[in-house]
Amino acid sequence: MTKIKAIFFDIDGTIRSFKTKTIPENTANTLKKLKEQGIKIFIATGRAPFHTTFLNDLLDFKFDGYITINGQYCYLENGEVLNDKILSQEDIKNVLPYFKENKIACDFALLDGAFMNLKNSRVKWLEDELGDPERFKEDPLAYDKAISEKIYQLNVFVLEEEEAGFLAYMPNSKAARWTTHFTDVIPKDGGKNTGIDAVIAHFGIKLEETMAFGDGGNDIDMLKHAGIGVAMGNAGENVKEIADYITTSVDDDGITNALKHFNVI
């Protein structure tokens, strides 16, 4: 087997448990062991950079880099930026009237923050899942800011069967769903896989020398792209179907078990 030199990890549902709202101790120890072995480890998340800082409170080491906002903003531990791409401003202008008319909740992601047009029961559900009951706050200026600010991603609180309605107004964008109640929206040519390409090009690592772990629909492109794509046991069926390997859940040492299976640790 090709020696693995870089591994990419989703956060929520992959290294962080939805049940305990934290990183299992064994998973943290395994991640640290990878670094000690000289393997580079990277976060690959739909979260914006400011929503990844909590990792510093949970771990006594740093990742080598971060693929954030589903690949739209990628940077190394030293702060060097490898990828920086915003959503089509034309798409955003086109879809805002649809959101208003249909009272659709949307969170607009910036690099250093986010703002929301309205809150509803689906938003409350996500706050509970993330263990952050006050994460989202309505901004009365949301629609004005959506036009004037650089928006990297939308979190649109619709069910899968409702996606087509708003995507009809966003021809340069695509949905990247990882849960039932909402979908991430990113550029059509974006995705965590583009972040992987930026990272390995920087370090001179071959694609076949990479692994990726994920559990959600927004991880599919990444898992298909990496040398070895591993779906967590708690992943959706659509994710498991495309994975090279299905491990146990995040709460049952899924990261560690898969790495042992492939003799990485």
What are these regions (language model features)?
Residues H225, G233-I265:
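Asp-based, Mg2+/Mn2+-dependent phosphohydrolase catalytic module
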Residues E25-V123:
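Active-site phosphate-binding/coordination module
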Residues K3-T20:
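Asp-based phosphoryl-transfer active-site loop
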